[in-house]
Design a protein with these regions (language model features):
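Extended, low-polarity transmembrane helix blocks
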Residues: 1-41, 58-71, 77-153
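Short juxtamembrane and helix-loop transition motifs at transmembrane-helix boundaries
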Residues: 43-56
Length: 153
């Protein structure tokens, strides 16, 4: 009975309810791929920042971050194992936020405010990723092309 009610509600989804999750996933992909391009374009500078934050083996860390970004972005773009991709990006983002944007350690008000802004942005992105973990990818996703065309849980 609940399943019938859910399938009836699902068939009455508006256009925006149907397409919004896909565009939301695309926004995440854009954010992470542009971040990857920034890492590639400023490799030495970011490696130096990591060294200054006492992160061991910065080139290896950056390589792992790029792999996580690529895998997570592909996952979100196609909606394939979306929840796994979102968890991967969530873990990477929260670690990066706490490690690299530790605003609570800054004495200068301007620098503290700048780092807080980046930390808050990353924290909000983590919230969006957790929503995707809980709610799934939306209707336009490879995850939803299981046997019988129904949504895989």
């Amino acid at each position: 009975m609940i399943q019938a009610a859910e399938s009836g509600a699902r068939s009455r989804m508006s256009f925006s309810e149907t397409i919004s999750p896909f565009f939301g996933r695309c926004a995440f992909v854009w954010f992470y791929l542009t971040s990857a391009m920034d890492i590639l374009g400023n490799w030495r500078g970011i490696a130096t920042d990591l060294t200054n934050k006492h992160v061991p083996i910065p080139p290896l860390v950056l390589l792992v971050v790029l792999v996580f970004i690529l895998l997570g972005s592909i996952s979100l773009l196609f909606g394939y194992h979306t929840r796994h991709g979102a968890v991967l990006l969530f873990g990477m983002t929260i670690v990066a936020a706490v490690t690299m944007h530790d605003f609570w350690h800054y004495g200068d008000a301007s620098a503290r405010a700048y780092q807080f802004g980046i930390f808050a942005r990353d924290f909000a992105i983590c919230g969006g990723l957790l929503l995707m973990v809980g709610m799934g990818p939306g209707p336009f996703a490879v995850d939803n092309t299981g046997k019988g065309g129904g949504k895989k849980r």
